[in-house]
Protein backbone atom coordinates (compact mmCIF):
# COMPACT_ATOMS: atom_id res chain seq x y z
CA UNK A 1 0.00 0.00 0.00
CA UNK A 2 1.46 3.38 -0.99
CA UNK A 3 1.19 6.68 0.87
CA UNK A 4 -1.39 7.89 -1.67
CA UNK A 5 -3.75 4.99 -1.03
CA UNK A 6 -7.03 6.05 0.60
CA UNK A 7 -8.85 3.50 2.73
CA UNK A 8 -12.61 3.02 2.68
CA UNK A 9 -13.16 4.94 5.93
CA UNK A 10 -11.43 8.00 4.46
CA UNK A 11 -13.64 7.78 1.36
CA UNK A 12 -16.83 7.53 3.40
CA UNK A 13 -16.11 10.30 5.92
CA UNK A 14 -16.35 13.34 3.57
CA UNK A 15 -19.51 11.94 1.97
CA UNK A 16 -21.08 11.37 5.37
CA UNK A 17 -20.20 14.89 6.51
CA UNK A 18 -21.72 16.34 3.33
CA UNK A 19 -24.88 14.28 3.84
CA UNK A 20 -25.25 15.43 7.44
CA UNK A 21 -24.74 19.09 6.50
CA UNK A 22 -27.26 18.77 3.69
CA UNK A 23 -29.81 17.27 6.09
CA UNK A 24 -29.16 20.06 8.60
CA UNK A 25 -29.60 22.96 6.16
CA UNK A 26 -33.44 23.10 6.19
CA UNK A 27 -33.44 23.11 9.99
CA UNK A 28 -30.83 25.87 10.14
CA UNK A 29 -33.01 27.99 7.86
CA UNK A 30 -36.16 27.15 9.80
CA UNK A 31 -34.81 27.96 13.26
CA UNK A 32 -32.54 30.90 12.41
CA UNK A 33 -33.37 33.77 14.75
CA UNK A 34 -35.45 31.51 17.01
CA UNK A 35 -34.91 31.02 20.74
CA UNK A 36 -34.02 27.54 21.99
CA UNK A 37 -34.14 27.00 25.77
CA UNK A 38 -32.01 24.08 26.96
CA UNK A 39 -32.15 22.62 30.45
CA UNK A 40 -28.71 21.16 31.20
CA UNK A 41 -28.61 18.44 33.85
CA UNK A 42 -28.10 14.78 34.66
CA UNK A 43 -25.04 12.81 33.58
CA UNK A 44 -24.19 15.44 30.99
CA UNK A 45 -23.12 17.70 33.87
CA UNK A 46 -20.62 15.28 35.41
CA UNK A 47 -19.05 13.54 32.40
CA UNK A 48 -16.18 15.56 30.91
CA UNK A 49 -16.72 14.38 27.32
CA UNK A 50 -20.45 15.12 27.52
CA UNK A 51 -19.81 18.56 29.01
CA UNK A 52 -17.48 19.43 26.14
CA UNK A 53 -19.91 18.17 23.48
CA UNK A 54 -22.75 20.12 25.10
CA UNK A 55 -20.69 23.32 25.07
CA UNK A 56 -19.84 22.82 21.38
CA UNK A 57 -23.52 22.23 20.58
CA UNK A 58 -24.53 25.50 22.26
CA UNK A 59 -21.80 27.48 20.49
CA UNK A 60 -22.74 26.00 17.12
CA UNK A 61 -26.38 26.93 17.69
CA UNK A 62 -25.34 30.55 18.21
CA UNK A 63 -23.02 30.53 15.19
CA UNK A 64 -25.77 29.36 12.81
CA UNK A 65 -28.18 32.03 14.01
CA UNK A 66 -30.15 30.40 16.83
CA UNK A 67 -30.58 32.11 20.20
CA UNK A 68 -29.77 29.46 22.84
CA UNK A 69 -30.58 30.00 26.51
CA UNK A 70 -29.17 27.53 29.05
CA UNK A 71 -30.82 26.76 32.40
CA UNK A 72 -28.98 24.32 34.65
CA UNK A 73 -29.48 22.26 37.77
CA UNK A 74 -26.89 21.00 40.22
CA UNK A 75 -28.49 18.76 42.85
CA UNK A 76 -25.63 16.23 43.05
CA UNK A 77 -23.05 18.99 43.41
CA UNK A 78 -25.07 20.59 46.21
CA UNK A 79 -25.32 17.24 47.99
CA UNK A 80 -21.57 16.66 47.77
CA UNK A 81 -20.69 20.02 49.30
CA UNK A 82 -23.25 19.65 52.09
CA UNK A 83 -21.79 16.24 52.88
CA UNK A 84 -18.26 17.65 52.86
CA UNK A 85 -19.12 20.34 55.41
CA UNK A 86 -21.09 17.88 57.55
CA UNK A 87 -24.49 19.50 56.95
CA UNK A 88 -27.28 16.92 57.14
CA UNK A 89 -30.40 17.56 55.09
CA UNK A 90 -33.73 15.80 54.90
CA UNK A 91 -35.96 15.16 51.91
CA UNK A 92 -39.76 15.41 51.90
CA UNK A 93 -41.63 14.11 48.84
CA UNK A 94 -38.34 14.10 46.96
CA UNK A 95 -37.48 17.72 47.79
CA UNK A 96 -34.61 18.90 49.95
CA UNK A 97 -35.61 20.70 53.14
CA UNK A 98 -33.64 23.93 52.75
CA UNK A 99 -32.96 26.10 55.79
CA UNK A 100 -31.06 29.40 55.58
CA UNK A 101 -27.65 27.75 56.00
CA UNK A 102 -28.41 25.16 53.31
CA UNK A 103 -29.64 27.93 51.00
CA UNK A 104 -26.27 29.65 51.34
CA UNK A 105 -24.64 26.46 50.07
CA UNK A 106 -27.20 26.15 47.25
CA UNK A 107 -26.45 29.69 46.07
CA UNK A 108 -22.72 29.08 46.30
CA UNK A 109 -22.91 25.89 44.24
CA UNK A 110 -25.54 26.86 41.66
CA UNK A 111 -24.69 30.53 41.21
CA UNK A 112 -20.96 30.09 41.64
CA UNK A 113 -19.31 26.74 41.02
CA UNK A 114 -21.71 25.13 38.55
CA UNK A 115 -22.79 28.27 36.70
CA UNK A 116 -19.26 29.54 36.15
CA UNK A 117 -18.04 26.11 35.05
CA UNK A 118 -20.69 26.03 32.31
CA UNK A 119 -19.88 29.60 31.30
CA UNK A 120 -16.19 28.71 31.07
CA UNK A 121 -16.92 25.58 29.01
CA UNK A 122 -18.95 27.54 26.47
CA UNK A 123 -16.43 30.37 26.30
CA UNK A 124 -13.56 27.90 25.82
CA UNK A 125 -15.34 26.69 22.66
CA UNK A 126 -15.57 30.19 21.23
CA UNK A 127 -18.91 31.29 22.66
CA UNK A 128 -19.67 34.38 24.74
CA UNK A 129 -21.61 33.03 27.69
CA UNK A 130 -22.83 35.19 30.57
CA UNK A 131 -23.68 33.60 33.92
CA UNK A 132 -26.80 34.71 35.78
CA UNK A 133 -29.06 33.68 38.60
CA UNK A 134 -32.74 34.48 38.63
CA UNK A 135 -31.95 37.26 41.10
CA UNK A 136 -30.02 39.25 38.48
CA UNK A 137 -32.13 42.02 37.00
CA UNK A 138 -35.10 40.74 38.99
CA UNK A 139 -35.47 37.95 36.43
CA UNK A 140 -37.25 35.36 38.60
CA UNK A 141 -39.69 36.32 41.32
CA UNK A 142 -40.42 33.30 43.48
CA UNK A 143 -42.93 32.30 46.09
CA UNK A 144 -42.37 29.77 48.84
CA UNK A 145 -43.41 26.25 47.91
CA UNK A 146 -45.45 24.44 50.54
CA UNK A 147 -46.22 20.75 50.31
CA UNK A 148 -49.29 18.99 51.64
CA UNK A 149 -49.77 15.56 53.17
CA UNK A 150 -53.01 13.81 54.08
CA UNK A 151 -53.18 10.59 56.09
CA UNK A 152 -56.95 10.15 56.05
CA UNK A 153 -59.59 11.42 53.67
CA UNK A 154 -61.64 12.99 56.46
CA UNK A 155 -58.71 14.92 57.89
CA UNK A 156 -57.58 18.30 56.50
CA UNK A 157 -54.21 18.05 54.72
CA UNK A 158 -51.06 18.86 56.65
CA UNK A 159 -49.17 21.81 55.14
CA UNK A 160 -45.42 21.21 55.12
CA UNK A 161 -42.94 24.10 54.94
CA UNK A 162 -39.64 22.92 53.41
CA UNK A 163 -37.86 26.26 53.74
CA UNK A 164 -36.14 28.08 50.90
CA UNK A 165 -37.69 26.01 48.12
CA UNK A 166 -39.79 28.00 45.71
CA UNK A 167 -41.86 28.02 42.59
CA UNK A 168 -41.94 30.60 39.82
CA UNK A 169 -44.35 33.48 40.38
CA UNK A 170 -43.13 35.78 37.60
CA UNK A 171 -40.40 35.97 34.95
CA UNK A 172 -38.99 39.30 33.73
CA UNK A 173 -37.22 38.39 30.47
CA UNK A 174 -35.61 41.77 29.77
CA UNK A 175 -32.07 40.81 30.82
CA UNK A 176 -32.19 37.51 28.93
CA UNK A 177 -33.66 39.19 25.85
CA UNK A 178 -30.91 41.79 25.83
CA UNK A 179 -28.17 39.16 26.02
CA UNK A 180 -29.74 36.50 23.84
CA UNK A 181 -30.55 38.76 20.90
CA UNK A 182 -27.04 40.15 21.02
CA UNK A 183 -23.84 38.16 20.79
CA UNK A 184 -24.18 36.49 24.19
CA UNK A 185 -25.44 33.17 25.54
CA UNK A 186 -27.30 33.42 28.88
CA UNK A 187 -26.55 30.65 31.40
CA UNK A 188 -29.09 30.75 34.22
CA UNK A 189 -29.01 29.21 37.71
CA UNK A 190 -32.55 28.50 39.02
CA UNK A 191 -32.52 30.78 42.06
CA UNK A 192 -35.30 33.31 42.51
CA UNK A 193 -36.07 35.98 45.05
CA UNK A 194 -39.34 36.33 46.94
CA UNK A 195 -41.27 39.44 47.93
CA UNK A 196 -39.78 38.85 51.37
CA UNK A 197 -36.30 39.43 49.89
CA UNK A 198 -35.24 35.83 50.56
CA UNK A 199 -33.59 33.53 48.04
CA UNK A 200 -35.38 30.39 46.85
CA UNK A 201 -34.11 27.32 45.05
CA UNK A 202 -36.47 26.33 42.22
CA UNK A 203 -36.62 23.14 40.17
CA UNK A 204 -34.51 23.78 37.05
CA UNK A 205 -36.95 22.03 34.70
CA UNK A 206 -39.75 24.33 35.84
CA UNK A 207 -37.58 27.43 35.46
CA UNK A 208 -36.55 26.37 31.96
CA UNK A 209 -40.17 25.80 31.00
CA UNK A 210 -41.37 29.15 32.33
CA UNK A 211 -38.50 31.02 30.67
CA UNK A 212 -39.29 29.27 27.38
CA UNK A 213 -42.93 30.40 27.66
CA UNK A 214 -42.09 34.02 28.42
CA UNK A 215 -39.48 34.20 25.65
CA UNK A 216 -41.94 32.58 23.21
CA UNK A 217 -39.23 30.05 22.43
CA UNK A 218 -39.35 27.81 19.40
CA UNK A 219 -38.19 24.84 21.46
CA UNK A 220 -37.65 23.66 25.02
CA UNK A 221 -35.09 20.87 25.35
CA UNK A 222 -34.78 18.91 28.61
CA UNK A 223 -31.63 16.78 28.91
CA UNK A 224 -32.21 13.66 31.03
CA UNK A 225 -30.58 10.37 31.97
CA UNK A 226 -33.01 8.34 29.85
CA UNK A 227 -33.53 7.98 26.08
CA UNK A 228 -36.81 9.89 26.47
CA UNK A 229 -40.32 8.77 27.37
CA UNK A 230 -40.51 4.97 27.23
CA UNK A 231 -43.44 2.60 26.75
CA UNK A 232 -44.12 -0.18 29.25
CA UNK A 233 -42.12 -2.44 26.94
CA UNK A 234 -39.14 -0.09 27.18
CA UNK A 235 -39.49 1.28 23.65
CA UNK A 236 -38.86 4.97 22.96
CA UNK A 237 -41.99 7.00 22.26
CA UNK A 238 -40.76 9.51 19.70
CA UNK A 239 -43.83 11.75 19.46
CA UNK A 240 -46.56 12.67 21.94
CA UNK A 241 -49.41 15.14 22.26
CA UNK A 242 -51.30 16.18 25.43
CA UNK A 243 -54.10 13.64 24.97
CA UNK A 244 -51.64 10.78 24.54
CA UNK A 245 -49.61 11.95 27.54
CA UNK A 246 -52.75 12.01 29.73
CA UNK A 247 -53.52 8.42 28.72
CA UNK A 248 -49.97 7.30 29.50
CA UNK A 249 -50.11 8.93 32.92
CA UNK A 250 -53.45 7.29 33.66
CA UNK A 251 -52.20 3.80 32.80
CA UNK A 252 -48.96 4.28 34.76
CA UNK A 253 -46.60 4.30 31.77
CA UNK A 254 -45.37 7.77 32.70
CA UNK A 255 -44.56 7.82 36.41
CA UNK A 256 -41.86 8.65 38.95
CA UNK A 257 -39.15 11.11 37.96
CA UNK A 258 -40.50 11.47 34.43
CA UNK A 259 -43.78 12.98 35.65
CA UNK A 260 -42.48 16.46 36.56
CA UNK A 261 -40.51 16.63 33.31
CA UNK A 262 -43.47 15.69 31.14
CA UNK A 263 -45.72 18.14 33.01
CA UNK A 264 -43.13 20.85 32.49
CA UNK A 265 -43.09 20.04 28.77
CA UNK A 266 -46.90 20.08 28.57
CA UNK A 267 -47.12 23.43 30.38
CA UNK A 268 -44.53 24.89 28.00
CA UNK A 269 -46.35 23.88 24.82
CA UNK A 270 -49.68 24.98 26.32
CA UNK A 271 -48.02 28.33 27.07
CA UNK A 272 -46.99 28.89 23.47
CA UNK A 273 -43.69 27.05 23.01
CA UNK A 274 -43.84 25.32 19.62
CA UNK A 275 -42.29 22.03 20.78
CA UNK A 276 -40.70 20.45 23.83
CA UNK A 277 -38.14 17.67 23.68
CA UNK A 278 -37.08 15.21 26.37
CA UNK A 279 -33.74 13.91 25.16
CA UNK A 280 -30.93 11.65 26.31
CA UNK A 281 -28.17 13.81 27.74
CA UNK A 282 -25.89 10.77 27.88
CA UNK A 283 -25.53 10.87 24.08
CA UNK A 284 -22.79 13.13 22.74
CA UNK A 285 -24.18 16.06 20.73
CA UNK A 286 -27.74 15.14 21.67
CA UNK A 287 -28.90 18.73 21.11
CA UNK A 288 -27.55 18.83 17.56
CA UNK A 289 -28.98 15.42 16.75
CA UNK A 290 -32.41 16.62 17.85
CA UNK A 291 -32.22 19.94 16.03
CA UNK A 292 -30.47 19.03 12.79
CA UNK A 293 -31.52 15.50 11.81
CA UNK A 294 -34.75 14.11 10.39
CA UNK A 295 -34.86 11.25 12.90
CA UNK A 296 -34.12 13.42 15.92
CA UNK A 297 -33.41 11.89 19.30
CA UNK A 298 -35.65 11.47 22.34
CA UNK A 299 -39.33 12.34 22.67
CA UNK A 300 -41.06 15.27 20.97
CA UNK A 301 -44.10 16.82 22.67
CA UNK A 302 -46.36 19.14 20.66
CA UNK A 303 -49.84 20.61 21.11
CA UNK A 304 -51.34 18.71 18.20
Swiss-Prot record:
HAMAP family: ArgB. Keywords: Amino-acid biosynthesis, Arginine biosynthesis, ATP-binding, Cytoplasm, Kinase, Nucleotide-binding, Transferase. CDD domains: AAK_NAGK-C (cd04250). Its EC number is 2.7.2.8. It is found in: Cytoplasm. Gene3D superfamilies: Acetylglutamate kinase-like (3.40.1160.10). Its main location: cytoplasm. It catalyses: N-acetyl-L-glutamate + ATP = N-acetyl-L-glutamyl 5-phosphate + ADP. Catalyzes the ATP-dependent phosphorylation of N-acetyl-L-glutamate. PANTHER family: N-ACETYLGLUTAMATE SYNTHASE, N-ACETYLGLUTAMATE SYNTHASE, MITOCHONDRIAL. GO terms for biological process: arginine biosynthetic process via ornithine; L-arginine biosynthetic process. It comes from the Bacteria. It is an enzyme of class 2 (transferase). Substrate binds at residues 74-75, 96, 201. Pathway: Amino-acid biosynthesis; L-arginine biosynthesis; N(2)-acetyl-L-ornithine from L-glutamate: step 2/4. The record marks 39, 261 as: Transition state stabilizer. GO terms for molecular function: acetylglutamate kinase activity; ATP binding. This is Acetylglutamate kinase. One of its GO terms (cellular component) is cytoplasm. Belongs to the acetylglutamate kinase family. ArgB subfamily.
Amino acid sequence: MTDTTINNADKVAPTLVARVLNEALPYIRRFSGKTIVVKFGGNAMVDDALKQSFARDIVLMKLVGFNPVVVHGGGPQIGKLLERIGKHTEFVQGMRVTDAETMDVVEMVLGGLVNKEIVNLINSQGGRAVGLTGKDGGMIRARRLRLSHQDAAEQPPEIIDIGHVGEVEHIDPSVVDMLDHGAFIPVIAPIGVGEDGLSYNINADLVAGKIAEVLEAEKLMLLTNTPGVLSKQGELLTGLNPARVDALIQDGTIAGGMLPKIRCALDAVAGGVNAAHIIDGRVEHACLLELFTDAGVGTLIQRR
